[in-house]
């Protein structure tokens, strides 16, 4: 993920070409299978990590059949199957932006080397653990195209912490543990969330424009192209024409 607007991120991924979309799907399949192994269950009702992985996959329009098959393969996987580890990295990008990266890897040395190489090539720098993590908060985020007061009331009554309205719809923020309660309440009230997932939200944003904005997006794109990288978050407030 890149930039500040979650709606812009959804549009970018939906508009990805076939090669890029295939890579996005592969990352989600890996995350789902790792969640099954780490959580010890193929049932999302009994495995929160799997439930979160499925929600993230659905947000990126991964087909239901792909998700189901990934779970089945992970449940039946042999003991010798690759054991992936969740790791995070932090760094700085053009315009003084903070970058937080989530990765899933079976070789940490390879992953950190690949990430450092991208930062060095694209005008950024890899930081130490804790250098920028404090600038982000883990939150649940629900996107809803319906901007009615009724929808907002349902969200607030069921635990929403913040609601941002734009031309695309509502971006509803929740505590991580309240995500599914709010999403289920909206669905039960007849509203249809576009997506709902756990993500990292910047506490404050930095306006980035012009050449710095283009360089930042090139850096984020290059990081997202790495097989081990699952998510890339920045605190950048980017112009719409750059995020698109």
UniProtKB/Swiss-Prot annotation:
- Chief location of this protein? cytoplasm
Keywords, A to Z, come to: Cytoplasm, DNA-binding, Transcription, Transcription regulation
Molecular function (GO) terms for this protein are: DNA binding
Q: Where is this region: Disordered?
A: 1-21
One GO process term, biological-process aspect: regulation of DNA-templated transcription
Family note:
Belongs to the TACO1 family.
What HAMAP family does the record tag this protein with? Transcrip_reg_TACO1 (MF_00693)
Name of this protein = Probable transcriptional regulatory protein Dgeo_2194
